[in-house]
Amino acid sequence: MGQGASTQTLNPNLAYITDDEVDHSMPESDGANPGAGNPSAKSKGKFPSLGKIFKPWKWRKKKTSDKFKETSEGLVLERKMSVRKPREELIERGLLKDIPENESNDVNHKAPPVKNGHTGPVPGDRKSDSGSEIDQDRRMDDTGERKEKRKRIGKRNDGTERMTEMIQSFQKMSLMQRSVGVQFVPEPKPASTSTKESQPPPKQAILPPKRVIAAPSSAEPAPVPPPPIAKPPPRTVSLNVDDSSRTILIPSLIAGDREVPPTVPAHTTPATVSTHKTLPTVPAHMTPPTVPAHVTTPAAPAHSNPPAVLLKQPPMPPPKPVHHSSNTALQGLDLSTVDPSQVPVPVKRSPPIPPKRNTPVTKRNSGDSSANLPEPPPPAPTSVPIPAAAPISAPPSTQSDPPSPTTEPPSQPPPLPLHIRIQRALNSPGPVHPNPEGSQRAHSLLFETPPDLINEALGGGRYSLPVTIEPLRLPEDDDFDMEEELQKLRAGPRPTQKPELEPRSRRGLVEDPQVAVIPEDAGSESSEEEEDESDSDQSIKYRDDNEEDDDEEDVPKSGLASRVKRKDTLALKLERQQEKEKSQEEDSSTWNNKEQWEAVRNKIGTALTRRLSQRPTAQELEQRNILLAKNEEVRRAERSEIKRRLTRKLSQRPTIADLQARKILRFHEYVESTHAQDYDRRADKPWTKLTPADKAAIRKELNEFKSSEMEVHEESRIFTRFHRP
C-alpha cells in the first residue's frame, strides 16, 4: 500500500478511534452529521406509515424509525468522540500500535520512508537534505497516509483479524500492571552498516553488562543540537526470562523523568553517547507486541517485520509520539552491545506469549538462562559503573505509575532501581547495604540471605526442607497426658537448618536457598495504589477475590436493586472482615498450661450450647407437622377426640324455627320454609363415586334411549352416532 505507517486500533470500540480515523470510519449516511438528524434516503413519507394504522393484522411491535435510530446513533457517536482519549495516551496504554507498511509503491514514489507522516532516517548518501524538503515530504505523506487509511478502513472487514487484535490488546492491558520501563539510547552504528539500512534491524540480546562502551571511531560526528522538545510519556516494556524450568518476572519499574537529549536531524547518524550506564538485565524475550527491536527471539514468528524500520529515528513533536522501538526521545540508558561479529541475523518478531504469573524464582548462575543466545556472555560483575560525567543518564526511580509529561522532576537523585539491586544480590552472595529511605524489612528479606543458607550453597549441597512425621494426640485418647504435651510445647524448637521466618511473611524455600519472596506487607502500598487506579473508573466491588460467586445471577437488576445490593455487600464485607479478625485471634490463642486449655474448652462449649439453644424445640416441630407424634395410638386418640367435638357442635345446630324466634333469620310472609331431610353434602364418600361399570351402564341406557325413543329429524339423521359400551 502506501508509505505511511498505519495506526491500527486494537480496541474495536469507537471511543478509541484515533483522530485520523474518525473522519473516514463513519459512513456518510449513518454518522457523518450526528447532531443534525437528517433523514436517510430510505425514510418514507407520512402517508404510507399512516396506512399501517388501519391494518389490524399488522399491529405488532412498531419498528423504530430510521430517523430516530440515526439521531440516537449520532448522539452516541458525538458523546463518545467528546470523551475520546488523546492519541499519545492510547499509544502509551498499548491500545494503538504502529505498523510500518511494506514499501510496495517504491517504483512510483521515491520519497524517503515516513512514520506517522514524518520522515524517518535515510541511508548515508542522502545527508544534504534541507529542513524545508523534510517538511514538504511530511505534508505530502500526511495526505497520502489519509487516503491509504480510507482504503484500509473500507477493507477491514475480516473478523478473524479483529479477534486476534482484541486478544493482543487484552494481553497487553493485562501486562501493563507489571511492566518494566526502560528508556533506550540510539545504538552506536558503524559506517559499514549503511548498506544494510534498508533491512529490518537486528534484534540484539539484552546482555549482562560487560563494560561501558565508548563511541567507535567510525561513527560520524553529531551536528549542533537544536533546542530540545517536550518529552513524550515514557513507555513501559515487560521483560520475561524464559527458561525451561522457571520464569522470572521482573518487578514493575518505570523510568523517571529526566532531561530530553537534543533532537537529531533525519539525514545524520547520531553519535554514541560515550559514558552511559549499562543496563544489567538478564536476556529476555519481549512479551507484548510493543517489543523493542533490540531483543532477540529465537522462535519463528507468525508475521514478518517489514523493512525500512531503522534503529535510529528522529524525535517527534509531543502530540504524535512515535511508538517505535528505537525512539531517540527515549534515551538515558544504553544497552551493552555485542561485537559486530556477534550481531545475529535479522529475525522476525515472535508471536506474543500470554503473560504468566509465577513465583519469582531466580538461579544461582545468571549465565544459565542465556543459553539460547548466539554466544553465552561471562557472568555479570557485582558493581555497575555510574559515570559522573553524564547528568542525563540518572538511574530511573522506582514508581508505581508511569509519570505524565507534566510531572515535576524529583528534587533529590533517585535511588538505585530495584532490578539492578536484585541483579547485584544474585551475583554476589555477600550482604548488600540496605536502602536508607526504603522499607528495611522488605530490603532485608530481599537481599540478605541467612548465613547458614550461604554456607550450604557454597558447599554445593542442595537444601531441602526437613520432614518430620509425628502421630497427633487428642485429649480424647486414652494415653493423652497433659504434662507430656506441655513439656513438648515448652521444649525449644529443634536446631534445624531452617532460617527463622517471620510469623505471617510469605517467604519460603523453593528448592533453592537463594530464593526470596517479598512478604505481604512490603508491597501492600503499591498494590493498593494499583487497585485504586484500576477501580477508579469501574463499579465498586466489595467482594473478596477468593469468594465464590455462586449467588451472582445473570438476571438483569433494576437500579434500586443494584443500589440496595451494593449497600448489602458493603455491610456483608465489613461483617466478614470482623469475623476473619476474630477467627485469626482465636487461631493465635494457643494453650500453654491447664488453665488456658480449660478456658479454650469452655469457650468452645459455650459457643456450642448457644448454637444448640437456637434450635427449635420438639413442641414447635410437632406444631409445624415436622416432627410426628410418639406413637400411632396417641395420634388415633387425638383424632377421635377432634371428631367427637365437631359432631357435638353439628348436632347442636339450631333449627330454622329457633333462628326465626331469635330474629336471626327473617323471612317474608310469602316465603315458605319446609323441613327437608338432613343429608351429608360432602362428596368424598366412596358410595357417591361412580365405578367404571356404573358409567358404562349409564352410557348404554342413554344410547338405547337415543337410538329408539329420541326423535331425530330426517335430514340430521346422518349426523347422529350411537356409542356402543
UniProtKB/Swiss-Prot annotation:
Basic residues bias spans: 55-64
Composition skew (Low complexity), residue ranges: 212-221, 265-276, 292-313, 385-401
Database matches in InterPro entries: RPEL_repeat
An individual GO BP term: actin cytoskeleton organization
Basic and acidic residues composition bias: residue spans: 65-100, 124-147, 155-164, 497-510, 567-585
Region feature (Disordered): 1-597
Gene3D superfamilies found in the cross-reference section: 6.10.140.1750, 6.10.140.2130
GO cellular component: cytoplasm; lamellipodium
Keyword line: Actin-binding, Cell projection, Cytoplasm, Developmental protein, Neurogenesis, Repeat
GO terms for MF: actin binding; protein phosphatase 1 binding; protein phosphatase activator activity
Location relative to the cell: Cytoplasm; Cell projection, Lamellipodium
PROSITE patterns attached to this UniProt entry: RPEL
RPEL repeats: from-to residues: 75-100, 606-631, 644-669
Compositional bias ranges of the Polar residues kind: 1-12, 166-177, 359-368
The UniProt record lists the keyword Cytoplasm: yes
Bias type Pro residues, positions: 222-235, 374-384, 402-417
Segments of skewed composition (Acidic residues): 522-536, 545-554
Main location: cytoplasm
Record-stated family: Belongs to the phosphatase and actin regulator family.
PANTHER family per UniProt: PHOSPHATASE AND ACTIN REGULATOR 4 (PTHR12751:SF4), PHOSPHATASE AND ACTIN REGULATOR PHACTR (PTHR12751)
Subunit structure: Binds ppp1ca and actin.
Function, as annotated: Regulator of protein phosphatase 1 (PP1) required for neural tube and optic fissure closure, and enteric neural crest cell (ENCCs) migration during development. Acts as an activator of PP1. During neural tube closure, localizes to the ventral neural tube and activates PP1, leading to down-regulate cell proliferation within cranial neural tissue and the neural retina. Also acts as a regulator of migration of enteric neural crest cells (ENCCs) by activating PP1, leading to repression of the integrin signaling through the rho/rock pathway.
Protein's recorded name: Phosphatase and actin regulator 4A
